[in-house]
Amino acid sequence: MQHTRAHRCALSALVALTLIPLTACGEGSSRAASPSSASASASASASAAKKPYGHAFQKLERTYSARLGVYAVDTGTGRVVTYRDGERFAHNSTFKAFAAGAVLRKRSLSGMDKVIKYSKKDLVANSPVTEKHVTSGMTLRDLCDAAVRYSDNTAANLLLKELGGPKALNAALKKVGDHVTHMERYEPDLSTWDPHSTRDTTSPRAFAEDLRTFVLGDALGKAERAQLTRWLRTNTTGGELIRAGVPKGWAVGDKTGMGSNYGGRDDIAVVWRPHAAPLVVAILTNRTEEDAKPDNKLIAEATSTVVDSLT
């Protein structure tokens, strides 16, 4: 779709207005992650300015002409690093981790050999695995593998349909305490972000806490949790994101996302450290220009700041 220069500038100005740090660092966390009130935001902004990492995140935003949202928690100490953690961002393909988790929760590991049939008309862009198996169909297990490890869009759509649609995944997330996330569309439409809308958005805090619940908590049984963890740890799409910002020897299980406009780029991860409890990290970003391209270095550098702040 073509846009006039004036329209693009207007949208850019709208996004730029959000470039004000709203959140700070503290001890512990809350499962609820609704946007802050004006007074709370003002207080948090003042607190954030006193934090060394707050300045680092502000610098990254200026450097990359971006809006950056961060929520990270040390699950051993409860210490957190937060920056715009209650603001809404497009979640893009990061939701696929939870689509797989919700299918595991619904079917259990014993039900993952169910074969799902589909046709060529079901295929959408960025479906490197499912496009090879139109004739035979794929098991739920293999669809989860394709969606999480290769970010296969058709696989994700088939998982959503297995659950009952995007709103069914939304309901599944509410059951584990997430009342922030909005799931409304299928791939690839959900990757187009509208700054005026809340559809297909979440907050860094909400998705970090969802990931913690599914991978480290009790949302899944032991076997199902182990399977989801294996998919995340063997993800093929995250080498330049959170994985690039942690020290050698640390293990990362992540799910990435990329928007089709505003340079949207996201990554959510559980990070296992030697001799210490895991970190859970969610970094969601967008650029200020509608036609901007994503830059993986923004997330890698933000991750390095998180690591420095929590270790």
Residue ranges and their predicted role:
Residues 2-19, 23-40, 49-57, 162, ...:
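Structured C-terminal helix/loop/strand segments within mature extracytoplasmic catalytic/sensor domains
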Residues 49-85, 271, 281:
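A short, well-structured edge-of-sheet supersecondary motif
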Residues 61-64, 72, 101-111, 120, ...:
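Sec/Tat-exported extracytoplasmic proteins
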Residues 67, 160-216:
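Mid-domain, small-residue-enriched loop/turn segments at the edges of structured enzyme/sensor domains
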Residues 75, 113-130, 163-164, 190:
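Acidic helix-start/capping segments at beta-turn-to-alpha-helix junctions
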Residues 78, 89-121, 147, 281:
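Active-site SXXK
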Residues 123-159, 166:
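Conserved catalytic neighborhood of penicillin-recognizing serine enzymes
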Residues 209-258:
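Conserved active-site loop region of the serine DD-peptidase/beta-lactamase
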